[in-house]
Every structure is written in structure tokens, then in C-alpha cells.
Amino acid sequence: MAHKKGASSSRNGRDSAAQRLGVKRFGGQVVKAGEILVRQRGTKFHPGVNVGRGGDDTLFATSAGAVEFGVKRGRKTVNIVAVGLTAD
């Protein structure tokens, strides 16, 4: 049986859906525990204080607070800092 298809057929024409990676919460934004901060492949950003890392390297907040980006030992890190409540 021939392995060539008939005329006017193509094996192309498919494309994969985008993975929607990137920073989801930016510096200074207030987040709740469990919110996703960064979707990534590999550790482009490393988890810092109050930040966890999922099995697919996603960074998420482990407590409520404000997002803070920084550098520690030459690595980009993401931290969650407590937001001070002001009494008016």
C-alpha cells in the first residue's frame, strides 16, 4: 500500500495553543494566600518569603500581603510582604 496520499492533501495546518506563561501579579499588588504570582517553565523567578513553588514551577502566595520582586544571590526572587493596616 502506498504511503503517499492523494493530490491536494497536506500534513500541515496545526498549531498549538499558547501556554499563557508570565507574571500574573506585579510588584505592589495585594494578594491573598493561594493566588498565582508567576507561571513559568523552569525557575526564571525563585520563590522567596511567603511564596511556594508548584510542580510545574508556578509561584504562588502562601500568605496574604503585597508582592515584592527582588534579587538575592544573583537570582530574581518573588516575596510576599505583610501589608500594615492603618487605623483611621
Curated annotation (Swiss-Prot):
The lineage of its organism: Bacteria, Bacillati, Actinomycetota, Actinomycetes, Mycobacteriales. The keyword Aminoacyl-tRNA synthetase does not apply. InterPro entries: Ribosomal_bL27 (IPR001684), Ribosomal_bL27_CS (IPR018261). This is Large ribosomal subunit protein bL27. GO terms for biological process: translation. It comes from Mycobacterium leprae (strain TN). Gene3D superfamilies: 2.40.50.100. Keywords: Ribonucleoprotein, Ribosomal protein. The keyword Ribonucleoprotein applies.
